[in-house]
């Protein structure tokens, strides 16, 4: 446990950010699953619409430093390849 006052404050903010990051990552995973489901159901229009949402979320995650840029690029590329199979 921290004894220094500033470290106690940092622990609070770190926990708050951790929960926000977890929530954000969960929402991204949900959209990715929806894209994969749309591809499995051969619904190209829905897949393309959800792909756009996924791209936005990955880019937002990079700008908020939730994700590394390479992680985001790799996942966007994989999703695009998946949608292109339709």
Swiss-Prot record:
Residues 1-20 are annotated as: Disordered. The keyword RNA-binding applies. It comes from Aster yellows witches'-broom phytoplasma (strain AYWB). One of its GO terms (cellular component) is cytosol. Keywords: Ribonucleoprotein, Ribosomal protein, RNA-binding, rRNA-binding. Disulfide bonds: none annotated. Binds directly to 16S ribosomal RNA. It comes from the Bacteria. SUPFAM superfamilies: Ribosomal protein S20. This is Small ribosomal subunit protein bS20. One of its GO terms (biological process) is translation. Belongs to the bacterial ribosomal protein bS20 family. Signal peptide: none annotated. GO terms for molecular function: small ribosomal subunit rRNA binding; structural constituent of ribosome. The lineage of its organism: Bacteria, Bacillati, Mycoplasmatota, Mollicutes, Acholeplasmatales. It holds the Pfam family Ribosomal_S20p.
């Amino acid at each position: 446990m921290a004894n220094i006052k500033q470290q106690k404050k940092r622990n609070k903010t770190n926990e708050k950010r951790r929960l926000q990051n977890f929530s954000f990552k969960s929402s991204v995973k949900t959209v990715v699953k929806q894209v994969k489901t749309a591809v499995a159901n051969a619904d190209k229009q829905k897949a393309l619409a959800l792909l756009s949402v996924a791209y936005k979320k990955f880019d937002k995650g990079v700008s908020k430093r939730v994700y590394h840029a390479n992680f985001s690029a790799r996942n966007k590329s994989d999703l695009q390849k998946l949608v292109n199979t339709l």
